[in-house]
């Protein structure tokens, strides 16, 4: 699996991900980029799950963003509708975290769209560790969103065997 974490604070949103690709108990690659910029660099997206499945979802989500002029929530809901009705999409095993200047969302493997409660989202095998670390840092420090995302991903990588210390970090300032 992997760990993807998104943190929003003080007009900044960040999505960070590790680089480990595992096949069973074997590390196949350590420097995969699981975080990308979409729609004219105005949307950030990260994935956890099967790599090929995630690329399919990235392509579909980017098409929805183009169709809906970059409106994040509408694009996510339309992708979720497709996910529930398209046989091929229903077999994909991946989750997306997407964010723009206004919202952060999780698009789940069941075709659900969830907006987080605390301006932070974490998915993947190390997601719970990253989320706990990020929430503690959000509530008890004045660190930036970038610093919180980086530190929480480091903590997840120290605990989760399917998460490494190679980081891809993208940020939007608005």
From Swiss-Prot:
Stated regulation of activity: Allosterically activated by HslU binding.
Active site: 2
InterPro entries: ATP-dep_Prtase_HsIV_su (IPR022281), Ntn_hydrolases_N (IPR029055), Proteasome_sua/b (IPR001353), Proteasome_suB-type (IPR023333)
The protein's Enzyme Commission number: 3.4.25.2
UniProt catalytic activity: ATP-dependent cleavage of peptide bonds with broad specificity
Residues making up the signal peptide according to the UniProt record: none
UniProt keyword terms in alphabetical order: Allosteric enzyme, Cytoplasm, Hydrolase, Metal-binding, Protease, Sodium, Threonine protease
Binding site for Na(+): 157, 160, 163
GO BP, one annotated term: proteolysis involved in protein catabolic process
Domain of life: Bacteria
Subcellular location: Cytoplasm
Class of the enzyme per the UniProt entry, highest EC level: hydrolase
Record-stated family: Belongs to the peptidase T1B family. HslV subfamily.
Quaternary context: A double ring-shaped homohexamer of HslV is capped on each side by a ring-shaped HslU homohexamer. The assembly of the HslU/HslV complex is dependent on binding of ATP.
NCBIfam families per record: ATP_dep_HslV, PRK05456.1
Protein name: ATP-dependent protease subunit HslV
Organism: Shewanella putrefaciens (strain CN-32 / ATCC BAA-453)
Designated gene of the protein: hslV
């Amino acid at each position: 699996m992997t760990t993807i974490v998104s943190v929003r604070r003080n007009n900044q949103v960040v999505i960070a991900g590790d680089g480990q690709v595992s096949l069973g108990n074997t590390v196949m690659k350590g420097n995969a980029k699981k975080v990308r910029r979409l729609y004219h660099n105005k949307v950030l997206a990260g994935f956890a799950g099967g790599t090929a499945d995630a690329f399919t979802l990235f392509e579909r989500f980017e098409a929805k963003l183009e169709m809906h002029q970059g409106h994040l929530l509408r694009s996510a809901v339309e992708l979720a509708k497709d996910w529930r009705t398209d046989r091929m999409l229903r077999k994909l095993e991946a989750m997306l975290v997407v964010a723009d200047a206004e919202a952060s969302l999780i698009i789940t493997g069941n075709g659900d769209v969830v907006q987080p409660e605390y301006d932070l989202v974490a998915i993947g095998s190390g997601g719970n560790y990253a989320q706990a670390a990020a929430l503690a840092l959000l509530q008890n420090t004045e660190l930036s969103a970038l610093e919180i995302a980086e530190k929480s991903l480091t903590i997840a990588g120290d605990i989760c065997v399917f998460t490494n210390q190679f980081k891809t970090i993208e940020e939007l300032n608005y």
